[in-house]
């Protein structure tokens, strides 16, 4: 398993962070908090229902910064952004909680989820079952598993932990080898294809198109990164890809929800507002 240098650095710090979190709050307490959290909102179902109707199933991201681009949004109020996305037609939210590299916070996820009715994925680098239980404790409805950061045994363990606490799983791949591992190891219906090359950081929508034939029809493909204009959306929809994870394009807009509506709905002749019921 070849892990890109930037990702290695993030994962090394993440291992330290998890140890620090465990020292502050033990697993038994996190499990107690997870049991008392609001019921999951059905992240996978929200996407699957939209895709079934051939409507855009948009996971709208709340992200303050990134390692490569720095701060993306100075005026950063997660609750405000969440409400804007919900009004703009998002199916789900993605909230960055990584502190050191993305200037995220658990509090951002809590604030965003409390401000709307949308299901939320905790976007972070998951390497320990503790983080999965913690995700449920802070209110997440889904977690992300990045294949390039995990071996198959750990990936399966994390997915099993997610299932045990009622969380959906979005598995993220970057190439055919990772896709093969993901399909062999996990039964989650959500397969995210990141169009960004982790080694070169170049973005190409061809990554999604190239991998599509290898993905069983009972899995929902979520294309991630590189959706910047209406032509990009239509390219995916022609190939029957209806689920999208978009962050940077929205974060740089004055009104993120309005930008979402413009990109995915305005030129379709109809605007879908709000979240689908679970």
From Swiss-Prot:
PROSITE patterns: IGPS
NCBIfam families for this protein: PRK00278.1-2, PRK00278.1-6, PRK00278.2-4
Organism: Pseudomonas aeruginosa (strain ATCC 15692 / DSM 22644 / CIP 104116 / JCM 14847 / LMG 12228 / 1C / PRS 101 / PAO1)
Any Gene Ontology biological process: L-tryptophan biosynthetic process
Xref: InterPro entries: Aldolase_TIM, Indole-3-glycerol_P_synth, Indole-3-glycerol_P_synth_dom, Indole-3-GlycerolPSynthase_CS, RibuloseP-bd_barrel
EC numbers: 4.1.1.48
Pfam families reported in the protein's UniProt record: IGPS
Main enzyme class: lyase
Annotated SUPFAM superfamilies: Ribulose-phoshate binding barrel
Family (UniProt): Belongs to the TrpC family.
Superkingdom of the organism of origin: Bacteria
Name of the protein: Indole-3-glycerol phosphate synthase
MF term (GO), any: indole-3-glycerol-phosphate synthase activity
Reaction catalysis annotation: 1-(2-carboxyphenylamino)-1-deoxy-D-ribulose 5-phosphate + H(+) = (1S,2R)-1-C-(indol-3-yl)glycerol 3-phosphate + CO2 + H2O
Keyword Cell membrane attached: no
Keywords (A to Z) from UniProt: Amino-acid biosynthesis, Aromatic amino acid biosynthesis, Decarboxylase, Lyase, Tryptophan biosynthesis
Gene name linked to the record: trpC
UniProt pathway annotation: Amino-acid biosynthesis; L-tryptophan biosynthesis; L-tryptophan from chorismate: step 4/5
């Amino acid at each position: 398993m070849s892990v890109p240098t930037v990702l290695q650095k993030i994962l090394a710090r993440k291992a330290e962070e998890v140890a620090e979190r465990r020292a502050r709050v033990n697993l038994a307490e996190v499990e107690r908090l997870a049991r008392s959290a609001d019921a999951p909102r059905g992240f996978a179902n929200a996407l699957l229902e939209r895709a079934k109707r051939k409507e855009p199933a948009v996971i709208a991201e709340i992200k303050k910064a990134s390692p490569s681009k720095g701060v993306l949004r100075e005026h950063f109020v997660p609750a405000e952004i969440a409400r804007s996305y919900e009004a703009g037609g998002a199916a789900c939210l993605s909230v960055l909680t990584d502190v050191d590299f993305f200037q995220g916070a658990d509090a951002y996820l809590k604030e965003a989820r409390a401000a709307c009715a949308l299901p939320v994925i905790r976007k972070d680098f998951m390497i320990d079952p503790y983080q999965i239980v913690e995700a449920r404790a802070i209110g997440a409805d889904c977690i992300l598993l990045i294949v390039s950061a995990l071996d198959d045994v750990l990936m399966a363990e994390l997915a099993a932990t997610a299932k045990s606490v009622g969380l959906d799983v979005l598995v993220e791949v970057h190439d055919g080898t990772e896709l093969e591992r993901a399909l062999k190891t996990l039964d989650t219906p959500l397969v995210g294809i990141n169009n960004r090359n982790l080694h070169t950081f170049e973005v190409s929508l061809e990554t999604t198109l190239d991998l599509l034939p290898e993905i069983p029809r009972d899995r929902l493909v979520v294309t991630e990164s590189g959706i910047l204009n209406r032509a990009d959306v239509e390219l995916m929809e022609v190939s029957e890809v209806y689920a999208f994870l978009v962050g940077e394009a929205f974060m740089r807009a004055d009104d993120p929800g309005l930008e979402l509506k413009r990109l995915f709905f305005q030129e379709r002749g109809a605007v879908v507002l709000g979240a689908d019921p679970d």
